[in-house]
Amino acid sequence: ILAKNTAVEHMIGGVPVTINIIDTPGHADFGGEVERVLRLADGCLLLVDAFDGPMPQTKFVLGKALELGLKPVVVVNKVDRPDARAQEVVHEVFDLLVELGAEDHALSFPVVYCSGREGWATRDINTKTTDMRAIFEAIVREVSPPEADPTKPLQALVTSLDYNEYVGRIGIGRVFAGVMKTGQQVTIIKRDGTTVSSKVQQILQFAGLKRVPVEQVSAGDLCALVGLTSVDIGDTVAAPENPVALPTVHVDEPTMTMLFKINDSPFCGQEGEFVTSRQIKERLERELEHNVAMRVAPGKTSDEFMVSGRGVLSLGILIETM
């Protein structure tokens, strides 16, 4: 349910090409995850089942991608199933794109057929291959590289947060312009326009499932930044001599609200370690640090909190994790 990203290197004509891959949740309840990380992307892979076709949640995520002008590469998975109907599914995807008002460049989408279980992908459904090369070739061919200028003043957008008990808060995002180096002084521009001075203590880049320390990143790179203690989702990390904010992350408003309060039944305090209103408040405040789609407001009394989210599933998972 959380967006994750990785990076792989693919050889094209003997030249290594770095491809950053961001996996987003499909359910509309976690739309906040989708909306904030789509700002990192230059294109999208629309993964559909060769039997089920586009699902209801496909419409939500695809609509958000089209709003940002991302061109889809359609990947039809599970074509090895005996009941697969790959060609019909491609037509259903086209109809969905038309319904969502996609532009002409999105309607002329390339199609890759694959079997994730057997580990192969192909442009021609009648030709079975032995690897997933066709997907990476489609990405390099169809998705334009980032339009980024490393000579301009630094601009980077933070779209998600991580936390490490040793280094504290870690801001994850993309450099849109300029170059950022380890030890560099930067200005953090908050969503409300205020600025905070800070220092980049460490820069991490993604390599497979690992994070690798690097000395610098330039325009177009995705990275994780250590040392920016006051950074939040949607903040711009900019050069101190020319701090210009990037458009912040827009997230749709919550659709339902639930009342959270301490257990005041006759069985209160008999189980559970964190049972006071102060502890509940601290936990909800911690959730707000990385969950941009959630809102918390005080209730009628000091031990009540009105928690708003996208749906029953997102609030239910919050309750389980608490």
Task: List PLM regions with ranges.
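Structural and coupling elements of P-loop NTPases
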Residues: 1-322
